[in-house]
Amino acid sequence: MADVALITVHGMGETPPTYADGLMDRLRGQLGSLAGQVVMRSVYYQKILQDNQNYVWERTREHSAVRYPDLRKFVLFGFGDAAGLENRKEIPGSVYELAQGEIARTLLSAHALRPGMPVVFVAQSLGCQVLSSYIYDAQKAARGQPVGAGIWRNIDAWALAAIGRALTASEKTFLGAGTCAALVTTGCNIPVFIAAHKIMHIIPIERPTSLFKWINFYDPDDVLGWPLQPLPGGYNELVEDRIVNASGGVASLLLRSWNPFSHNSYWDDATVVAAIAAMLRRLAA
Protein backbone atom coordinates (compact mmCIF):
# COMPACT_ATOMS: atom_id res chain seq x y z
CA MET A 1 0.00 0.00 0.00
CA ALA A 2 1.25 3.49 -0.82
CA ASP A 3 2.43 5.50 2.17
CA VAL A 4 3.74 8.60 0.38
CA ALA A 5 3.35 10.24 -3.03
CA LEU A 6 6.11 11.69 -5.19
CA ILE A 7 4.81 14.28 -7.67
CA THR A 8 7.20 15.76 -10.24
CA VAL A 9 6.75 18.95 -12.27
CA HIS A 10 8.94 19.53 -15.31
CA GLY A 11 10.72 22.69 -16.34
CA MET A 12 11.06 24.83 -19.44
CA GLY A 13 11.96 23.74 -22.94
CA GLU A 14 10.99 20.83 -25.15
CA THR A 15 9.96 18.06 -22.77
CA PRO A 16 8.78 14.47 -23.43
CA PRO A 17 6.05 12.88 -21.29
CA THR A 18 8.68 10.44 -19.97
CA TYR A 19 10.83 13.26 -18.54
CA ALA A 20 10.78 11.89 -14.97
CA ASP A 21 11.37 8.20 -15.74
CA GLY A 22 15.11 8.37 -15.10
CA LEU A 23 14.70 10.12 -11.77
CA MET A 24 12.04 7.66 -10.65
CA ASP A 25 14.21 4.68 -11.61
CA ARG A 26 17.14 6.08 -9.62
CA LEU A 27 14.89 6.69 -6.62
CA ARG A 28 13.50 3.16 -6.75
CA GLY A 29 17.06 1.87 -6.77
CA GLN A 30 17.92 3.84 -3.64
CA LEU A 31 14.67 3.03 -1.84
CA GLY A 32 14.97 -0.72 -2.33
CA SER A 33 12.19 -2.60 -0.55
CA LEU A 34 10.47 0.68 0.38
CA ALA A 35 9.93 1.60 -3.28
CA GLY A 36 6.57 -0.18 -3.32
CA GLN A 37 5.30 2.18 -0.64
CA VAL A 38 5.87 5.26 -2.80
CA VAL A 39 3.42 6.16 -5.55
CA MET A 40 5.21 8.18 -8.24
CA ARG A 41 3.40 10.50 -10.63
CA SER A 42 4.57 13.15 -13.09
CA VAL A 43 2.74 16.33 -14.06
CA TYR A 44 2.97 17.05 -17.80
CA TYR A 45 1.84 20.46 -19.03
CA GLN A 46 4.23 20.90 -21.98
CA LYS A 47 1.67 19.43 -24.41
CA ILE A 48 -0.40 22.59 -23.93
CA LEU A 49 2.40 24.66 -25.49
CA GLN A 50 4.56 22.39 -27.62
CA ASP A 51 2.61 22.19 -30.90
CA ASN A 52 2.62 25.96 -31.34
CA GLN A 53 6.30 26.18 -30.42
CA ASN A 54 7.20 23.45 -32.90
CA TYR A 55 5.30 25.31 -35.61
CA VAL A 56 7.23 28.55 -35.00
CA TRP A 57 10.54 26.67 -34.82
CA GLU A 58 9.99 24.80 -38.09
CA ARG A 59 8.90 27.98 -39.86
CA THR A 60 12.04 29.71 -38.64
CA ARG A 61 14.30 26.88 -39.81
CA GLU A 62 12.66 26.68 -43.22
CA HIS A 63 12.55 30.38 -44.02
CA SER A 64 15.52 31.94 -42.20
CA ALA A 65 19.22 31.44 -41.55
CA VAL A 66 19.92 31.19 -37.80
CA ARG A 67 22.97 30.04 -35.86
CA TYR A 68 23.25 28.03 -32.63
CA PRO A 69 20.11 25.98 -33.37
CA ASP A 70 20.13 23.93 -30.15
CA LEU A 71 20.51 26.95 -27.89
CA ARG A 72 18.08 28.97 -29.98
CA LYS A 73 15.47 26.20 -29.77
CA PHE A 74 15.92 25.99 -26.00
CA VAL A 75 15.37 29.74 -25.71
CA LEU A 76 12.30 29.64 -27.97
CA PHE A 77 10.65 26.77 -26.10
CA GLY A 78 11.84 27.80 -22.63
CA PHE A 79 10.97 31.46 -22.71
CA GLY A 80 7.92 30.68 -24.82
CA ASP A 81 6.73 28.47 -21.95
CA ALA A 82 7.23 31.27 -19.43
CA ALA A 83 5.53 33.88 -21.61
CA GLY A 84 2.64 31.57 -22.43
CA LEU A 85 1.98 30.74 -18.79
CA GLU A 86 1.94 34.34 -17.63
CA ASN A 87 0.26 36.01 -20.61
CA ARG A 88 -3.42 36.80 -19.97
CA LYS A 89 -3.52 34.15 -17.30
CA GLU A 90 -6.76 35.51 -15.87
CA ILE A 91 -8.66 34.50 -19.04
CA PRO A 92 -10.76 31.31 -18.63
CA GLY A 93 -8.98 28.46 -20.38
CA SER A 94 -5.60 30.21 -20.23
CA VAL A 95 -2.35 28.24 -20.34
CA TYR A 96 -1.93 29.09 -16.64
CA GLU A 97 -5.30 27.52 -15.83
CA LEU A 98 -4.70 24.48 -18.02
CA ALA A 99 -1.30 23.84 -16.43
CA GLN A 100 -2.86 24.02 -12.97
CA GLY A 101 -5.47 21.55 -14.14
CA GLU A 102 -2.72 19.07 -15.00
CA ILE A 103 -1.30 19.37 -11.47
CA ALA A 104 -4.74 18.80 -9.98
CA ARG A 105 -5.44 15.74 -12.14
CA THR A 106 -2.10 14.21 -11.19
CA LEU A 107 -2.81 14.77 -7.51
CA LEU A 108 -6.28 13.25 -7.89
CA SER A 109 -4.77 10.06 -9.29
CA ALA A 110 -2.49 9.79 -6.24
CA HIS A 111 -5.31 10.60 -3.82
CA ALA A 112 -7.34 7.70 -5.23
CA LEU A 113 -4.69 5.27 -3.97
CA ARG A 114 -4.59 6.59 -0.42
CA PRO A 115 -6.40 9.75 0.68
CA GLY A 116 -4.45 11.92 3.05
CA MET A 117 -1.00 10.49 2.44
CA PRO A 118 1.97 12.90 2.59
CA VAL A 119 3.19 14.35 -0.69
CA VAL A 120 6.72 15.18 -1.79
CA PHE A 121 6.87 17.55 -4.75
CA VAL A 122 9.96 17.74 -6.97
CA ALA A 123 9.95 20.64 -9.43
CA GLN A 124 12.53 21.73 -12.00
CA SER A 125 13.18 25.18 -13.50
CA LEU A 126 9.95 26.86 -14.65
CA GLY A 127 8.02 24.07 -12.94
CA CYS A 128 9.05 25.60 -9.61
CA GLN A 129 7.18 28.79 -10.46
CA VAL A 130 4.22 26.84 -11.86
CA LEU A 131 3.94 24.74 -8.70
CA SER A 132 4.58 27.62 -6.32
CA SER A 133 1.80 29.64 -7.97
CA TYR A 134 -0.54 26.64 -7.81
CA ILE A 135 0.04 26.13 -4.07
CA TYR A 136 -0.13 29.87 -3.38
CA ASP A 137 -3.47 30.12 -5.19
CA ALA A 138 -4.83 27.05 -3.36
CA GLN A 139 -3.83 28.42 0.03
CA LYS A 140 -5.37 31.78 -0.79
CA ALA A 141 -8.63 30.11 -1.81
CA ALA A 142 -8.62 28.02 1.39
CA ARG A 143 -8.48 31.26 3.41
CA GLY A 144 -11.55 32.50 1.55
CA GLN A 145 -9.63 35.19 -0.33
CA PRO A 146 -10.32 35.90 -4.02
CA VAL A 147 -7.97 34.28 -6.53
CA GLY A 148 -7.43 36.12 -9.80
CA ALA A 149 -6.50 33.29 -12.16
CA GLY A 150 -6.29 29.53 -12.49
CA ILE A 151 -8.45 26.69 -11.24
CA TRP A 152 -8.51 27.94 -7.64
CA ARG A 153 -10.50 30.98 -8.71
CA ASN A 154 -13.41 28.52 -8.58
CA ILE A 155 -12.23 25.00 -7.82
CA ASP A 156 -15.79 23.66 -7.68
CA ALA A 157 -16.55 24.88 -11.20
CA TRP A 158 -13.26 23.43 -12.44
CA ALA A 159 -14.04 20.03 -10.92
CA LEU A 160 -17.49 19.86 -12.51
CA ALA A 161 -16.06 20.75 -15.93
CA ALA A 162 -12.93 18.58 -15.68
CA ILE A 163 -14.09 15.43 -13.89
CA GLY A 164 -17.87 15.77 -13.99
CA ARG A 165 -18.52 15.86 -10.26
CA ALA A 166 -17.87 17.78 -7.07
CA LEU A 167 -14.69 17.19 -5.09
CA THR A 168 -14.87 15.61 -1.67
CA ALA A 169 -13.46 17.55 1.26
CA SER A 170 -10.52 15.13 1.36
CA GLU A 171 -9.81 15.61 -2.34
CA LYS A 172 -9.99 19.38 -2.05
CA THR A 173 -7.48 19.37 0.81
CA PHE A 174 -5.17 17.01 -1.06
CA LEU A 175 -5.35 19.03 -4.29
CA GLY A 176 -4.55 22.16 -2.30
CA ALA A 177 -1.25 20.61 -1.11
CA GLY A 178 -2.74 20.24 2.34
CA THR A 179 -0.70 17.08 2.99
CA CYS A 180 2.54 18.30 1.41
CA ALA A 181 5.46 17.23 3.60
CA ALA A 182 8.33 18.31 1.36
CA LEU A 183 9.24 20.34 -1.70
CA VAL A 184 12.47 19.96 -3.65
CA THR A 185 13.19 22.61 -6.27
CA THR A 186 16.05 22.35 -8.78
CA GLY A 187 17.28 25.00 -11.19
CA CYS A 188 14.57 27.24 -9.76
CA ASN A 189 13.87 30.57 -11.46
CA ILE A 190 11.20 31.98 -9.14
CA PRO A 191 13.37 35.11 -8.63
CA VAL A 192 13.05 35.92 -12.35
CA PHE A 193 9.27 36.13 -11.98
CA ILE A 194 9.16 38.22 -8.81
CA ALA A 195 12.21 40.48 -9.09
CA ALA A 196 10.20 43.37 -10.55
CA HIS A 197 7.55 43.23 -7.81
CA LYS A 198 7.50 45.62 -4.89
CA ILE A 199 9.04 44.03 -1.80
CA MET A 200 5.77 44.01 0.12
CA HIS A 201 4.19 41.99 -2.70
CA ILE A 202 6.78 39.18 -2.59
CA ILE A 203 5.02 36.54 -0.50
CA PRO A 204 6.00 32.85 -0.53
CA ILE A 205 3.70 29.94 0.09
CA GLU A 206 2.86 29.04 3.68
CA ARG A 207 4.06 25.80 5.26
CA PRO A 208 1.31 23.33 4.31
CA THR A 209 2.09 20.98 7.22
CA SER A 210 4.23 20.92 10.34
CA LEU A 211 6.51 18.36 8.66
CA PHE A 212 7.13 20.58 5.65
CA LYS A 213 10.69 21.00 4.43
CA TRP A 214 11.75 22.90 1.29
CA ILE A 215 15.19 22.25 -0.19
CA ASN A 216 16.30 24.31 -3.18
CA PHE A 217 19.24 22.97 -5.19
CA TYR A 218 21.08 25.36 -7.48
CA ASP A 219 24.32 25.33 -9.47
CA PRO A 220 26.22 28.65 -9.25
CA ASP A 221 27.14 28.23 -12.95
CA ASP A 222 23.48 27.85 -13.99
CA VAL A 223 22.11 31.31 -14.80
CA LEU A 224 18.55 29.94 -14.73
CA GLY A 225 18.96 28.28 -11.33
CA TRP A 226 18.73 30.68 -8.40
CA PRO A 227 19.08 30.64 -4.61
CA LEU A 228 15.85 31.49 -2.80
CA GLN A 229 16.96 32.38 0.72
CA PRO A 230 18.06 35.92 -0.28
CA LEU A 231 14.50 36.75 -1.35
CA PRO A 232 12.43 38.93 1.00
CA GLY A 233 9.08 38.03 2.50
CA GLY A 234 10.08 35.00 4.54
CA TYR A 235 11.96 32.82 2.05
CA ASN A 236 15.03 32.73 4.31
CA GLU A 237 13.08 30.94 7.04
CA LEU A 238 11.10 28.74 4.64
CA VAL A 239 13.77 27.41 2.26
CA GLU A 240 17.14 25.72 2.63
CA ASP A 241 19.43 26.49 -0.33
CA ARG A 242 21.98 23.84 -1.27
CA ILE A 243 24.72 24.20 -3.88
CA VAL A 244 25.38 21.36 -6.33
CA ASN A 245 27.50 20.95 -9.44
CA ALA A 246 24.74 19.85 -11.79
CA SER A 247 26.93 20.31 -14.89
CA GLY A 248 29.21 17.50 -13.74
CA GLY A 249 32.44 19.42 -13.27
CA VAL A 250 33.55 19.29 -16.91
CA ALA A 251 37.01 20.70 -17.51
CA SER A 252 36.59 22.73 -20.66
CA LEU A 253 36.10 26.47 -20.16
CA LEU A 254 33.49 26.41 -22.93
CA LEU A 255 31.50 23.62 -21.30
CA ARG A 256 31.80 25.18 -17.87
CA SER A 257 30.06 28.24 -19.27
CA TRP A 258 26.29 28.11 -19.08
CA ASN A 259 24.46 25.80 -21.46
CA PRO A 260 21.05 24.10 -21.46
CA PHE A 261 22.66 20.79 -20.46
CA SER A 262 23.84 22.22 -17.15
CA HIS A 263 20.35 23.56 -16.44
CA ASN A 264 18.63 20.26 -17.17
CA SER A 265 21.02 17.91 -15.35
CA TYR A 266 19.94 18.35 -11.73
CA TRP A 267 17.93 15.14 -11.59
CA ASP A 268 21.01 13.18 -12.66
CA ASP A 269 23.02 14.53 -9.73
CA ALA A 270 23.69 11.96 -7.00
CA THR A 271 23.36 14.54 -4.21
CA VAL A 272 19.92 15.64 -5.41
CA VAL A 273 18.65 12.08 -5.85
CA ALA A 274 19.95 11.05 -2.42
CA ALA A 275 18.18 13.97 -0.74
CA ILE A 276 14.85 13.12 -2.38
CA ALA A 277 15.26 9.44 -1.50
CA ALA A 278 15.98 10.34 2.14
CA MET A 279 12.75 12.36 2.32
CA LEU A 280 10.71 9.52 0.84
CA ARG A 281 12.38 6.96 3.08
CA ARG A 282 11.58 9.00 6.19
CA LEU A 283 7.91 9.33 5.22
CA ALA A 284 7.46 5.73 4.05
CA ALA A 285 9.18 4.02 6.97
Language model regions located:
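Lipid deacylating catalytic domains
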Residues: 1-62, 82-122, 126-285
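Short, structured active-site "lid" loops
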Residues: 60-70
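A hydrophobic C-terminal alpha-helical subdomain
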Residues: 70-84
